[in-house]
């Protein structure tokens, strides 16, 4: 592949890690952010210590404070901003772009109020003449491991497989491999909804429950993620792949996962506002819980774990009470889809 220029919108942990992958592949990387001190640090110190204390970034990775400058002449744009601001940033991109680009996103969540998937948000805000079909970059991937070039395999999903293949070639190297997929709904819902289950898995750990309970919430969590995704139009096979069970395992079992850590702290009795403040990073599973719960109600999808976590976060229910409600609920067949 010839050298490409990519603007990464969002200098967080994942945006920075993906920037390093692209830089390793010989591409020109521009990281845009709205915190001047962070951009100055990337340019002057070649670090992003808020997320990676011991990592030195390549000097060719440049930070940008001005969005128009970051987008000037690029081949592709990668959104890695929090879900709640994706629409706002997309509006700004639509105003600043002067030519057609490949548009990708690597964020995992649903828009809080509309419950829309992020590719839908990007399609609405960026005119078709300025973009490709959206490509979703998602899968089991801790930024802390990717940044040190540990082996990582994820998916590139798009309605247009040719564009997905472009992204596959853009990122893939000896430690980072992408597989193409045309099930955008499945890949996006899997990436968003697994954060809810990770919060629950962390809470079980914080409460002192063992491996049996953790395995159960991952398995049953995958079932209800699949239920909702299929109701939205996804291919059920996607949930047995990298962006489905793969991402659920890595997020639902690891201390690297901010959603798991948030759940762990809640399980230990800490208040949500304290957990969010101490984390210092966006916990997508919190807002996604509300969106998924409301979607499930709207579509008539049975999601008991999501409902239990919703009650704990938004209705003040005790975690043990929520667990008891699941354990003593109506007996059901394991493979029921409603």
From Swiss-Prot:
Subcellular location: Cytoplasm
Keyword Coiled coil: no
Residues involved in sn-glycerol 3-phosphate binding: 108, 139, 141, 194, 247, 257-259
Reactions performed catalytically: sn-glycerol 3-phosphate + NAD(+) = dihydroxyacetone phosphate + NADH + H(+); sn-glycerol 3-phosphate + NADP(+) = dihydroxyacetone phosphate + NADPH + H(+)
Family matches, as InterPro entries: 6-PGluconate_DH-like_C_sf (IPR008927), 6PGD_dom2 (IPR013328), G3P_DH_NAD-dep (IPR006168), G3P_DH_NAD-dep_C (IPR006109), G3P_DH_NAD-dep_N (IPR011128), NAD(P)-bd_dom_sf (IPR036291)
Transmembrane spans: none
Name of the top EC class for this enzyme: oxidoreductase
Domain of life: Bacteria
Residues annotated as catalytic: 194
Molecular function per GO: glycerol-3-phosphate dehydrogenase [NAD(P)+] activity; NAD binding
GO cellular component: cytosol
Alphabetically ordered keywords of this record: Cytoplasm, Lipid biosynthesis, Lipid metabolism, NAD, NADP, Nucleotide-binding, Oxidoreductase, Phospholipid biosynthesis, Phospholipid metabolism
Single GO biological process annotation from the record: glycerophospholipid metabolic process
EC number: 1.1.1.94
Functional summary from the UniProt entry: Catalyzes the reduction of the glycolytic intermediate dihydroxyacetone phosphate (DHAP) to sn-glycerol 3-phosphate (G3P), the key precursor for phospholipid synthesis.
Sequence similarity: Belongs to the NAD-dependent glycerol-3-phosphate dehydrogenase family.
Name of the featured protein: Glycerol-3-phosphate dehydrogenase [NAD(P)+]
Native source species: Streptococcus suis (strain 05ZYH33)
